[in-house]
Amino acid sequence: MYSSHQNRAYGSRRLAKETAGALAQAETRGLISEVMYNEDQPWMTQLVLLPLLQQLGQQSRWQLWLTPQQRLSREWVESAGLPLTKVMQVSQMNPQVTLDSMIRALETGNYSVVIAWLHDDLTDDEHRRLTAAAEKGNAMGFLMRPVQPSLPGDRPRSALRIHSGMVH
């Protein structure tokens, strides 16, 4: 018998997987979303993003991770069920280079998803450029940003507020 907590956790995982499948299969023209995370709760981001990344891993295109200083471990990529042969990572990038690299990568159409870590808010022009690049390349872009204290009513443009840390 499962406890009520286990049943809720299973239901949440199943819903996340179904939603990820629908997003990955949808005929999208491109998507940019900001994901707010808190490193104290890594399971939440993994619960939401991993099923989507696993579905996107079935495409012939690459997954690009633009990380500031952290490196993805081979063991984590494999245990997360991501295709090791389709995951690329570039690290040690400054924020402006990261943004420009993300735009170029999204435009190419070679990547199903580009994930980048940024600490600062985007300007309207930067958001417009990212959205146009994602639409051109028919790709998804996730901007990972740590939770910052904010003003009441302040929120990301198109976002998932997830308290987590996928970075190792």
Curated annotation (Swiss-Prot):
A Pfam family hit: SulA
Region (Lon protease binding): 161-168
SUPFAM superfamilies in alphabetical order: P-loop containing nucleoside triphosphate hydrolases (SSF52540)
Region annotated FtsZ binding, chain positions: 105-111
Induction (UniProt): By DNA damage, as part of the SOS response.
Keywords for this protein: Cell cycle, Cell division, DNA damage, Septation, SOS response
UniProt PTM comment: Is rapidly cleaved and degraded by the Lon protease once DNA damage is repaired.
BP-aspect Gene Ontology terms: division septum assembly; DNA repair; negative regulation of cell division; SOS response
Family affiliation: Belongs to the SulA family.
PANTHER family cross-referenced by the UniProt entry: BLR3025 PROTEIN-RELATED, CELL DIVISION INHIBITOR SULA
Subunit: Interacts with FtsZ.
Protein name from the UniProt record: Cell division inhibitor SulA
Organism listed in the record: Cronobacter sakazakii (strain ATCC BAA-894)
Taxonomic placement: Bacteria, Pseudomonadati, Pseudomonadota, Gammaproteobacteria, Enterobacterales
